[in-house]
């Protein structure tokens, strides 16, 4: 039961997302992308116990401007016995104006997989989740569990929070409310950072996810915590950032 709860918690905090500054060696006549590529490394703790690491990698396709975002969790120590395979999630998406549109989502953990394609012209999200068929109606603003992090970052930048979102989670569409909880200053390996705290929660659910976004880093989340009934369960904290 503990290992199942650990896995659910790590997936629930679903990868804080960074949007780093445009690289210094970029062409002067080339406009910066809405979201610049980055690689970030985080610690992962379960009830104050170190269970492994989390790596986030955002790439942009130079040909069409679309993005590929990968989140990988690697267990360490005794937890590696339970989770011998890395947990991997990927989202491919485009950015239209200041909004994210997911195109496909993939996840794998050992023999368990999720594969969802977003057909916006046909108005359906279809695929398979843990061997169950997925067929959901698309609506404007619908996100997957990875692309939502980028959408929230862009909304912070543009002052569009608080806001409700619909998110495809496996074979369901779930409703979440993202709210602002105010400023906070954090000490991190990147230095002391002023952050904005954002909380997300489903109606009637006792679990709350909080993320600390740093405006000076392009609203990169430098910390994420999930709590239940006010008690901390899981946490991710940034260690390094490359861009």
Question: Where are the model-predicted features located?
Answer:
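Acidic, serine/threonine-rich low-complexity disordered tracts
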Residues: 29-120, 157-243
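N-terminal processing/targeting junctions
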Residues: 16-17, 225
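Boundary at the C-terminal end of the N-terminal hydrophobic targeting segment
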Residues: 19-28
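Hydrophobic, well-structured mid-protein blocks that either form specific transmembrane helices
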Residues: 110-151
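Hydrophobic alpha-helical segments and their boundary regions
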Residues: 3-4, 37, 144, 148, ...
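Bacterial N-terminal signal peptides that target proteins for export
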Residues: 1-13
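N-terminal trafficking/processing presequences and adjacent post-cleavage segments
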Residues: 27-32, 144, 150-156
